[in-house]
Every structure is written in structure tokens, then in C-alpha cells.
Amino acid sequence: EMAGAMSDVAIGTAPLRQEVHHVPSPQELDFGNRGFNLADDDNGIYVRPDIGNNILVGSTEPECDPLHWVDANHEGQIQPEQWEAQVLRLNRRLPAVGVPHQRKGVVGVYDVADDWIPIYDKTCVSGFYVAIGTSGNQFKNAGIAGHCMAELIMAVENGHDHDSDPVQVTGPHTKLNIDMGNFRRTRTVNPNSSMSVHG
């Protein structure tokens, strides 16, 4: 904003408070080695393995959970109600987890775009690029997001007019086309978005 680079950005972003909780995996489950990322929309959570045979459990923003929009500099503590809700939801899928005596986890702030789809684009200021509005869902896409941004930057710096002819990137592993126009700053809100961490 200080450089005036955001003057033509049509999609807004806002800070959203999030909690991800950390619980020990039952030894017999060996989630640290055999676990996988799982989105459980029936229970409103996602889980993924963490080091030391632990489980990370976060929210998929079910309708019953209010969203907590905060100041960008927000710092917070784990809220007992949120911790209990997510751990009990995890127990519906994995009853052997139980309810740990100690609450552990992290509190952070997601940078959420209006349609929960990130903005990967150039700006109206030459040499300024943005990768913003990535919500919480882009931690798993960091590698390909970096690749796409590098391709976009190289194309624009070499004279490509991304605004009138969106850069097309080929996925390095899938060889599928990625239309960078889907992530541009001047798009309208995508009505087909899940409007959630799923993107």
C-alpha cells in the first residue's frame, strides 16, 4: 500500500484468526508415519500428521463456527471452547485419540481474499508483485505457488502483457496448464469458490 501498488486491486483481503491444535496420536495408530492429510467436512475439521507421532487438527470453517476477523497484528491464546470443539470433532473420527489434559496448538492469522482464492499477480507499479490472500489453504501449495510466481515475474519482466493476455504456466510434474488469470488482482469475486479454507 505504501508504494501505491494496490490501487487497482479489485479483490480485498482481511485477517482471519485461526487455531490449529496439536494432540498426541494413539501409539497403535502411528499417525506420524502412516497418517495423511484429511479434510473431514462432516465434522468441520482437517487433520495432518505432525512430528513425534502427533496430529494437527484445524477447522474447515463449518457454518456453526463463527469466523473471527481481527486486526492484522492480532496475538492470541488458544480458546478453550475452540480447542474442545476441534478435539471432540476429531474424536468422532478417531475415538482412540481421547481428550488430552493439556491444550496445545498455535494461534495465527490467515490473509483471506474476498473469495478465498489467492492473488498471484503483478501490480500497477513496475517491479512490484503480490502473492497475497492465500488464506490457510496455501501452505500445501507453497512450492507450486513459488514456481507460478517465478514464471509470471519472468514473463512480465520480459515484456509479456499479463493484464490482456494472462500468463499460462505448465505444472512441472503434472504438465497441466495453470491459467494465472484465475488469480489476478483485477478479477471479480468467483461465485463458484467454496468460500472456505478449501479454496
Where are these regions (language model features)?
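C-terminal lid/capping helical subdomain adjacent to the catalytic/cofactor pocket in oxidative enzymes
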Residues: 124-199
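Active-site substrate-recognition segment that forms the wall
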Residues: 1-126
